[in-house]
């Protein structure tokens, strides 16, 4: 079984789990949560954090907890939609990590890869980095990690372009931070790159 078949199997498993969760949460109405009347897939619902006006908020941000890397500003956008081999290993490690869900700030140059997650432009930059707010619910963690893995295969760690956000309405503060999964992803990316280089070196011999 190759990596693409494994990823397809994982995706089917996730879809079954999502369908079971939706059946348990039904309250008697006949309207489907994930599809409209025409059977089209609906986008991830907006989160309240995406609709706030942050002009009067105090923004707290810094380097990532794992490497101290700040958010980077790039002159060009980066995105590709090719199947991701790395995503297979990332999902196998992070499938049970519910902290992957949440609202994230994504730097503008990386935002095209996250167009399926209801991106909303944030009117204030984080330092000198403009970006979008996206919402990742519990059922969209797999496609989210696939998008992160695609950028990872191009050399982009989420520490460079993404921060999770937490809003304290009482103190009017917004905290931009990295979860433990950022560090876990960086480790997986490192070992995946090492295996790719090893495979390439063996082919060149």
Curated annotation (Swiss-Prot):
Protein name: Uncharacterized protein ORF22
Acidic residues composition bias: residue spans: 22-39
Annotated region (Disordered), positions in chain: 1-40
